[in-house]
């Protein structure tokens, strides 16, 4: 599996309607407008996180139970809240951060914005938190219960420049 599937430069991701704020910023960067330099952790990266962390298995199990999706999502979040990002995804994130060469970064998703991140462990924790958002997990449990593919979403990591 190629680690470059996990990370793209802002402006190189492609424009999907359901990419939310990340998709809008990517579109602006692709159009040549001035936006912060950044990198996008792709939907493929999110899929890898779900698979390697065990979240995918837990979401499917929760969907089969047919209980309240919000409660199930909270339980899944609690079980995986300290899961370390590992393997190929970890390497891809570390290499991308080195390439970004920013002292302070922000992680942005549809449900989360965490700034003032100064270390690789802080960034990886924010990535995990974004992919374990309660709202996102609830949507995944509901989709699995309907027999649909689990929704995934990209994350933007960009330099937090002082203006």
Which residues does each predicted region cover?
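N-terminal beta-alpha lobe that positions the nucleotide/phosphoryl donor
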Residues: 1-162
């Amino acid at each position: 599996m190629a680690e470059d599937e996990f990370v793209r430069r802002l402006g190189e991701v492609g424009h999907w309607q359901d990419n939310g704020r990340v998709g809008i910023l990517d579109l602006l960067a692709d159009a040549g407008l001035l936006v912060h330099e950044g990198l996008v952790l792709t939907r493929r990266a999110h899929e890898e996180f779900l698979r390697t962390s065990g979240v995918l298995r837990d979401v499917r199990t929760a969907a089969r139970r047919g209980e309240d999706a919000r409660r199930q999502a909270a339980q899944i979040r609690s079980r995986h809240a300290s899961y370390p990002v590992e393997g190929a995804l970890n390497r891809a994130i570390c290499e991308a951060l080195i390439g970004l060469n920013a002292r302070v970064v922000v992680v942005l998703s549809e449900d989360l914005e965490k700034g003032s991140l100064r270390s690789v462990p802080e960034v990886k924790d924010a990535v995990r938190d974004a992919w374990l958002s309660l709202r996102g997990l609830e949507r995944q449990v509901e989709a699995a219960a309907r027999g649909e593919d689990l929704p995934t979403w990209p994350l933007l990591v960009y330099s937090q420049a002082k203006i």
